[in-house]
Every structure is written in C-alpha cells, then in structure tokens.
Amino acid sequence: MKLYKVALAPNPTKVMLYIAERAELGTDMGIEQVTVNTVKGHHKEPEHLIRNPFGTVPALELDDGTFIKESLAIIMFLEHKFPNKALITGTPEARGHAIDIERIVDLRIAGPMGGYGHATNSPLGYPADPERAESLKDNMQTPLNH
C-alpha cells in the first residue's frame, strides 16, 4: 500500500500519526509514504487526479490498485485490516464517542484553524484577511470549549 501525503496538512498528518501510533504498538502495516508537492501543484496534475479526483491528500492506494481518499475512511480501513492492537476499541458507545471527537476536531477545529492560518500568515502567500480570521477564531471557540 502507498499513502500519498503532504507534510503539515491536517488530514494527512492525522493518518500519519495513526500509522505511527500503530507502529509503536508493534503493527507494521508496510505502507510506503509518498509526498505530493502541493506547493508546486502536483495534487492537481492528472497523475494524482487518478488517485483522488478531488485533488486532495491523503490518498491510500490499496494492493488491488484502488484508492481510499478520506482520512477517517483510511483510518477505519486500517483498523479493520490490522485489528491486532487497534486504537479505536471498546464498546460501540466508546467507539462512537471516539469517532464523534475525531469529527468535531476535523470539521470544527482543524479546518477553521487552517483557514485562520491562511487568513493571518499564509504559508502559501494568500493575502491577509483580518475579518475572516476573527470570524474563524470565534467559530472555533465552542468546539474548543467542548
């Protein structure tokens, strides 16, 4: 299997941390990690769009040549493919709460946090947008307090 990723982006980082945690627990998944240079636009090139038509990362290439394109779907696939020493365990309620927390962080904190970074000091050179930054900061407060 191959994981197509970019350093520092939240969704690929989530998957990379998951793989690293599982490796610490002794589960070698044998996943090759391939960096996609998003700064140079490689994620929008035809080669990557075959992997993920949305032009995003991560994308996990399975042994049969198909791809899983969303971070949580990749993690859940790996949980089931390598069940020994899984991270999302316990009762159905405990698993539900774990996924609930993941979704809150992903949708209500990490996404707006990335937008805030781009609105204040974008590593990609986007112009500053103080009003948007303030709005994103306000929107993150409730989930952060949760």
Q: Which ranges hold each PLM region?
A:
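GST-like domain detector, emphasizing the conserved glutathione-binding G-site
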Residues: 1-138
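Short, intrinsically disordered, charge-balanced linker/junction segments flanking boundaries
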Residues: 136-146
